[in-house]
Structure formats: C-alpha cells, structure tokens
Amino acid sequence: MAESNKMKDMPVNKLMVQMGIPMILSMALQAVYNIVDSAFVGNMRSGSEAALNALTLVFPVQMLMVAVGIGTGVGTNALLARTLGQGNSKKAAKVAGNSLFLGAIIYIVCLLFGIFGVKAYISSQTVDPQVISMGTNYLRICCVISFGIIFFSLFEKLLQATGRSLYSTIGQVVGAVVNIILDPITIYGIGPVPEMGVKGAAYATVIGQVVSAILLLVFHMKLNREFEHDTKYMKPDRGIIREIYAIGLPAIIAQALMSIMVYVMNLILKFSPSAQTAYGLFYKVQQFVLFLAFGLRDAITPIIAFSYGMHSKKRIKDGIRYGLLYTIVLMVIGVAITEIFPGEFAALFNAGASREYFIGAMRIVSISFIFAGINVAYQGIYQALDGGMESLVISLLRQLIIILPLAGIFSFFVRGGHIGVSLIWWAFPITEVTACIVGYLFLKRINKNKVESLN
C-alpha cells in the first residue's frame, strides 16, 4: 500500500501499531544513550561518584538541545502531514526545506553555548572542582558536536510525517549500536584508544548521533518523494516558519520545561549530593519509560493531523481512542518493571552511596507513570488538532507550576530534619494526577470545538 494511501485508508488501530512500534523503539533507544553513558561511567575505575554527579548536572542542557530539535520537528511533522493530506506538494517541500534552515540556526546557538557558557552553567549547581571539570568537559563536547542530534531529530520527523517511521528507527538503532560499542572503548581505553573517562562517554554519544543523522539524511532524500528536494526550499519563509512554531513551540517549551525542572530540582537537592545523583539516575529511568509514550505520541500526532486535514471525523476519534488505550498499556508495563526491579537498576549504575535514595525514588515516582503517559498522549492529540495552547498548559502544570513549588515546600521539611528525602519524590505523582484531570477537560473541549464541528 502506498504511503499516502496507508495514512488515508489503513484501519487506524493497525496503522498506529505499524507506525508506533518503530517510533517507540526509536524513542527508547534515544533514552538508552543517557542510560548507557551512566552505566559505563558508574563503573569507572576511579571517580565514578563524581562522574555520575557530573552527568546528572549536564542532563538538563542535553535535554534542552533535544527539546529544540524535536519541538521544531514536531511542528514540521504535523504541518507536513496535514499539507500532504491536503495534496499540496509544493508547500510540503517548503515545510521540509525551512525545517532544515531552522536546524542550522539551532546548531549555531548550541555551538556558541558550548564554547562560552558551559563552565558557568555547571558551576551554578556544585562547588566540587572534580565535578565541575568532568561536567564541563562532557557538555562542551556534546554542544560543539550537537549537529548530529539536531538534524537527526528533524529528519526523523520528516520520515514519520510520510509514514516511514521504520527508517527513522533503523537510523536510531545504528546510532545506538555505535554508541554502545564505542562507550567502553573510549571511556576505559581499549587497544590503541586512550582512557578518556567522561570525555570518552561524550565522544561515543555524539559519534552515534552523527551516524544516525547521516543515515536519515540518505533515507529522506531517497524515500520522501511526495515533494521535491531542492536547496531553494531552504530559503526562510516567514509564513511557514510561523506555522511550524505555532504547532512546535508548545512542544519545545514542553521539552524545555523538563530541562528547567531537572535544573531546579538539582538546586533543591543541592543539600544532599547523594540525593542529587539519585534523582539524576532515576530520572533517566523515568525518561526511558515515558519515552515509550513519546514514541507512541509521534504516531498519534501525524495520524490525527492527516485525518484532520482530510476532515475524517471517524479516523480522528479512532486515533484518540487507540492512542490513549495503547499508551495506558505501555505505562502499565513500565510501572511493573520499575516497581519490581529497582535494585537491579541501582546495580546497573553502581549507585554506591545514592543506592537507597534511588530505590526509594523509583518506588514512589513510578506510581505516576500511567497518568504521565496519558498526559503525553493528550499533548500529541492537542498538537494534531491545533491545540498548541492546551498542550502548553499541561506542560506548565507538569514541569513548573505544580511540581517545583511542591518539591520546594517538601524540601523545607526535609532539610529541617522532620522527614526523609522520600517526601520530595511524592511531588511527582501528585503533579501528574492533577495535570491528567485538567487534560481530560481540555480533550472534551477540543473534541467539541474541533472534531464535532467538522462537516
């Protein structure tokens, strides 16, 4: 079945599985980058505790780079899918070309931060000179060679928008394999390669990302034939850029808020380096679970957006129903794994003094996964139906308005010696349940105003 016909005619439940599985694997492998780095770094011969703390502190900036790349890609994805659904191939070519122009601008900003801003950022979260040195070295490499992750994110969304998510997953798998192979070689020093410690982890990560980006560039040029490829379409078009970010900016802010949340949580937990490290480790496991929901969301959005472009009320409703159902199934599996095996995750990271904090955090925070996954699915639905503001509000509730004040208040009692650090972890499930209730109300309103009103 041709790709455009598949998006139009294939039953939605089957289409979502076919598109969703590669995307889920792709997002899971993206989370593996950070988990693999932490696992290998945690087993370094010396300085592993400081190195794990350094990776915790650099994580918000890594997330921010991904946020801007993926958010721009999300806007491109939804707009391109809708444009193709309307049969406008010329505009589709401009959408794809402008997304690549935006990618170049994003890389220049990351490059400048990598050269001039990294050390000041790390120093704001710790006074330990070893952690500052390790964090600065790692993050500078990731920023200066960030073009891999930025352009991978864009090409991934361009392929997903045309229903070719399998190829984006192939690129992700190849990059992940390269990263995993290089990690022990560059971190520990094997054969002619010298021992580089955290620098080696950074080099392994960015090389894997560059390989993925190059492979997806080839797939994009050879397979996305629904529209023309030409550098003339990279000429900035204000109207198209505005449309991309009308959809994608809330996604960027949503992802950026995750970075802000992690950064502020690091500051809140600054009183206990072990708790700070534990938070960084469990957050990577949490992201691994939630990235399953993000992957499915990336199938939900183009399916519903394409259906919205062709005014198919039934396919939109099917997309919403199956998207939420499949998300809940994935999150139940995630809760089961994290509740049953927290000790095994701690052993993987060689968590040391942070072990008990890590296990306690996992058992409490995993309660929130089902509600968090539903919130992610809601946001994918909103983005497909021009509900960017609703998506932004859910992100603000989850990443800023509720969780940070709660965690700050709870930390006041913890620092006063009235109760253990575990109180802070309860801010996560409270936040997700509250946001989920608000998200349901938004979904009802969007369904009434956008879907039921279709002719």
Task: Walk through the language-model features, giving the residues of each.
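Small-residue-rich hydrophobic transmembrane alpha-helices
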Residues: 52-112, 149-168, 278-342, 372-386, ...
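N-terminal transmembrane alpha-helices
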Residues: 7-39, 43-47, 60-75, 79, ...
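Helix-terminus/linker motif at the lipid-water interface of multi-pass membrane proteins
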Residues: 28, 32-53, 122-129, 185-196, ...
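Transmembrane alpha-helix boundary and packing residues in multipass membrane permease domains
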Residues: 23, 27, 39, 78, ...
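Transmembrane helical elements of multi-pass membrane transporters/channels
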Residues: 18-37, 141, 175, 208-212, ...
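Short runs within selected transmembrane alpha-helices of multi-pass transporters and secretion channels
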Residues: 73, 142-160, 168-176, 201-216, ...
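Short alpha-helical transmembrane segments in multi-pass integral membrane proteins
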Residues: 1-20, 80-147, 193-248, 304-368, ...
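Small-residue hotspots at the loop-to-helix junctions and early N-terminal turns
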Residues: 49-60, 135, 139, 273-288, ...
